[in-house]
């Protein structure tokens, strides 16, 4: 992985800007749906860790050690783990909720990462995701396809044209609810594992 995520202070500043320009309420809504033992998958610099209800027992996970150093400053009592989505270092069925915010666009093998999420979720658990996805507008999808190679290199692996909802369903989840923000092609949704 290369790109902005390798420069945690810059990544953090960009996230702060995005939260002030509209992403903040979406991230709060994502955290509000977390229950019990929760894995914050791709917690980055820890901006979302402070949003959880005190009753939630969160664990932050990110593949970039430098991001976790910054996350530690924000969430001193939250356990933090340096690992990738494709190889989660947890037993099967230990989480009530897995939260992922703008992560699966950058996971190299999204199908494998989602299989791992399904493995660590309890049978009645929930996956809560906020993702930007491939546009349903033909012209915008074509633009996403066009910029994808350059954007992926600059951004640390982000693929703006991924069909994330379809990938989630193929990984064995049923999407229960979702909100859309068409102008940004953002989706906030909750999914349950099919057994």
Regions found by a protein language model. Give the residues of each.
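C-terminal lobe and adjacent flexible extensions of AdoMet/dcAdoMet transferase-like proteins
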Residues: 188-195
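C-terminal alpha-helical "lid/dimerization" subdomain adjacent to the S-adenosyl-L-methionine
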Residues: 5, 14-17, 130-182, 188
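Conserved class I S-adenosyl-L-methionine
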Residues: 1-35, 47-48, 70, 144-151
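A short SAM/SAH-binding and catalytic strip from SAM-dependent methyltransferases
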Residues: 97-109
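A short glycine-rich, Lys/Arg-flanked "PGG" loop and its adjoining helix->strand segment in the class I
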Residues: 111-123
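A short acidic, Gly/Pro-enriched loop at the edge of an enzyme's catalytic core
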Residues: 86-98
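Class I SAM-dependent methyltransferase SAM/SAH-binding core
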Residues: 39-40, 44-87
């Amino acid at each position: 992985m290369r790109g902005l995520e390798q420069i945690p202070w810059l990544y953090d500043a960009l996230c702060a800007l995005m939260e002030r320009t509209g992403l903040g309420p979406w991230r709060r809504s994502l955290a509000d749906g977390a229950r019990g033992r929760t894995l914050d998958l791709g917690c980055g610099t820890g901006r979302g860790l402070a949003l959880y209800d005190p009753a939630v027992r969160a664990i932050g996970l990110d593949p970039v050690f430098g991001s976790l150093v910054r996350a530690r400053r924000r969430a001193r009592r939250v356990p933090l783990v340096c690992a990738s989505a494709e190889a989660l270092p947890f037993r099967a069925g230990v989480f009530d909720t897995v939260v992922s915010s703008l992560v699966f666009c950058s996971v190299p093998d999204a199908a494998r990462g989602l299989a791992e999420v399904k493995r660590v979720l309890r049978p009645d658990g929930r996956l809560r995701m906020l993702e930007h996805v491939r546009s349903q507008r033909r012209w915008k999808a074509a633009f996403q396809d066009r910029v994808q190679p350059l954007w992926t290199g600059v951004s640390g692996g982000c693929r703006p044209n991924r069909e994330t909802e379809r990938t989630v369903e193929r990984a064995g989840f049923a999407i229960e609810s979702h909100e859309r923000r068409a102008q940004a092609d953002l989706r906030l949704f909750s999914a349950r594992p099919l057994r």
